[in-house]
Amino acid sequence: MAPGDVLRIEIAVKVSPGITSSVVNAATVTGGDAEAGASVEDRTTISSTGAGFGVSDLAATWSSEQAGSSVNLTTGFTFNQVVNGGETAPAADAKEVALNLPPGFVANPEAVPQCSVSDAEHDTCPAAAAVGVAFTSSGSGVGGAPTPYSSLVYNTVPSPGELGALTLFLPTGPIRLSLGIRSNSDYELRMAANDLPSLEPLLSMTLTLWGVPAAYDGAGPDHAPAETGPGFGGPGAPQPTRFLTSAGTCGALPASTLSADSWTAPSVFVEVSSMTSALSGCTRLPFDPSISVAPDISEANEPSGYELDLNIPQSGNPEGLASADLKDASVTLPEGVGISLSAANGLQACTERDVGLGSPAAVTCPEASKVGDVEVQTPLLANPLQGAIYLATPNANPFGSPLAMYIVAEEPWAGVSIKLAGQIDANQLTGQLTIALRALPQLPISGLQLHLFGGRAGVAEHPCSVRVSHEHERTGAVERKHQRHSHQRLRC
């Protein structure tokens, strides 16, 4: 069997009325030049009472345990099923199904050619847009048996509010998977299919997405298992690119979760989870950031702005490893730089409720609390995320500190929003200010620019000499810090 192929075995079990029990299904695979075989067991409940709507099992596995590498994702799930009059059907027809991956796993729709919405609807997508393969089983088959089906999965032009989109096919037509980054504290990659067909309801699906689609160029399934050639196909491309990348965090990972609702009970979701194998090799990930920080005025003892520019190289080479994700970044301003009381007196504050940390809700911070602008670049998006920096309410912020700020950056077309809290500490002996961003999202950030306003909205004023230090550190099994210093003399 080729990687991604599915072998389906159905076993009929006769159960006496009033009996509830369970059986264990066990499977073992060997060969393929593997050093050792692999085994798995799955316990299935057997009952004379029909199952209610739900997902009986979920599996999400990766092709490599190397952190930050190009990996294939294979995920499979089965809806609870009933047999009536010899016909297999789901306990209820699924309406929406969504898969959330652990933080740090990312897909880059910009790295692969896209299929137009029209071509996707008519099943005429070019091979270059293929990024995976799906094997499905649906109801209403011949003689009441489930209908097996196989299809390539295509990278599709997204709609407004989507990071990306994928299209696969059932006998009755296409299914669209919407890709997005959840606007919560973990910023997980989410794949969701809405309004699934009820004419031929979905029973099960096994989906494989390729880390490097060009590596799977071949015949592949064309709505039927291929009789010759590889078990599945892929795009041909002159320069292979990375579509799917594993997280840059080592050790135990959060579970992948799948939620689903039904047409008979919409918005009533069931949820199952699947543990993911731990990743390793974080110390191998490259991390070579550069940063510059400078005031934007040349007059001392005046409310000043600051320009912070952070850049992290991001390689799309599928044979290499991705850069480690930025975890923390801090900037320590020079001695003598203090809070500009004249400017701060005219500012308002943004509350935790106004900013809505960990929520996709719209930001309602007062305009008078805005103290700067922000821009974030990522290879996942064609356009940067842009937004504002707000002064947080003193002592009523995530740090309970007198000084803090909120950073909000959005890309509305892709539906991506990032909200961060930044701590501002004043050294009790020297008065030096340190601005720190902690636990940044596990996303590939290639650039981060912060501009703190000067003038009436400025929150800092300078002495005659400026010496700025800043450090940033990587995530992973071993933390690695980079520290830089810069100097600038102002007119007094």
Indicate where each model-derived feature is located.
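Ser/Thr/Pro/Gly-rich, low-complexity intrinsically disordered stalk/linker tracts of secreted
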Residues: 5-492
